[in-house]
């Protein structure tokens, strides 16, 4: 989220990050699969307040990366961000390791919903079929999408230059992707 903090998106590990703020539960607990399943309404209260940032606009860094892609100097972006600001800035080849707040799906019928549906619903967002809608983001206790991870490995292997920014490099497996750069 470091690239997005300029856009008003909270990060996790900085002094002002979510991990240093007081909540009823630690953020890493709230953003876990088991918490989502057991305390779904509390999950969505936190998610709406802290993870959905409807007014966020791409930062200068997002725009520079998009301009580099447009100029043919950047072949892709591998990001842990879930905010979609790279795409909003114009980047097209974005691999979102942790998913996106812009995709939400029904756990029962797999129908997709925009983030506004989550934001504007009260309590636990439900599909017309009655199923709970889950953000398409990777929660703690969940694995990364293997197809996205494989795409990231391939993009890094093919790169002749690797720009790393806005990360503490402590979240695995994302932090381990550096080893694929030669």
PLM segments and residue spans:
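Conserved catalytic core of sirtuin-type NAD+-dependent deacylases
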Residues: 1-182
């Amino acid at each position: 989220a470091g690239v997005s903090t300029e856009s008003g998106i909270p990060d996790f590990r900085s002094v002002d990050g979510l991990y240093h703020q007081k909540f009823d539960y630690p953020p890493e607990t709230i953003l876990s699969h088991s918490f989502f399943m057991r305390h779904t309404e509390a999950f969505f209260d936190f998610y709406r307040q802290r993870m959905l940032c409807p007014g966020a606009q791409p930062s200068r860094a997002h725009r520079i990366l998009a301009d580099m892609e447009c100029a043919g100097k950047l072949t892709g972006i591998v990001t842990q961000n879930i905010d979609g600001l790279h795409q909003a800035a114009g980047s097209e080849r974005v691999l979102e390791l942790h998913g996106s707040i812009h995709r939400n799906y029904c756990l029962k019928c797999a129908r997709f919903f925009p983030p506004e549906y989550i934001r504007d619903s009260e309590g636990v967002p439900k599909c017309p079929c009655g199923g709970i809608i889950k953000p398409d983001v990777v929660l703690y206790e969940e694995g990364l999408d293997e197809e996205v991870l494989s795409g990231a490995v391939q993009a890094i292997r093919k790169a002749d230059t690797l720009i790393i920014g806005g990360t503490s490099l402590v979240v695995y497996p994302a932090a381990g992707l550096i080893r694929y750069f030669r």
